[in-house]
Amino acid sequence: MSDYRKLAFVGNVGSGKSTIVRTLSEIEVVDTDRPSTVDIGKELTTIGIDYGRIGLGENMALGLYGVPGQKRFSMLWDHVNRSLWGLAFLIKYSAKPDVDSLLQVIEFFQPVANDTPFVVAVTHADQADDDSLESFCTVFQEILAGNGLPAAVMAIDCTSRDSAMSIPLYINAMHGARGDT
């Protein structure tokens, strides 16, 4: 594979970043999950960048970067943000959409200014009925539109390779529609 690109998965605790990198990667994943010292609803938490890689097409190697979404990890964001091929914001379904986290990611990563295809992926969507999930997604679609982003909001299952692949395939299609090589 002659062409290397970067796809970053950013999101809050429990959104599925480590899981999606493990699900998609064709190599052994470098993960930075460590036991949590506070109650976050799970045993392990990501304290750095998780890394995996997949082939996409005949000539592309896609680096998969799982990055914590909390602002205190912004020094990692700087590293990952250079030359991004695509950016996915993972948000765990809940009764109340976490709008502030999305706005923080948009402000920092500047997907419009950097011309980076951007996707919002709703995880744990199985916890919602259809109407609740649609309302949840609509909130994010309105925010994206208000920020000039022609991005998709999609529900995914981070443990399913077919479902998780919808993110890189969508971003690849966005590049194709723009005539990017």
Predicted regions located by residue number:
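Conserved G1/Walker A P-loop phosphate-binding module
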Residues: M1-E43, G52-L56, L62-G63
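Conserved catalytic network of the ASCE P-loop NTPase/AAA+ motor domain
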Residues: T46, G55-M60, H79-S83, Q110-D115, ...
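Switch II (G3) loop of P-loop NTPases
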Residues: E58-S74
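Inter-motif core of Ras-like GTPase G domains
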Residues: F73-A95, F109-A113
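Conserved Switch II/interswitch segment of TRAFAC-class P-loop GTPases
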Residues: S83-L103, A125-S132
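Conserved beta-strand/loop subsegment of P-loop NTPase cores
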Residues: G86-L90, A113-A125, A145-D157
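Charged helix-capping and loop-helix junction motifs
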Residues: S101-E107, E134-V139
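Canonical P-loop GTPase G-domain recognition
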Residues: A128-T181
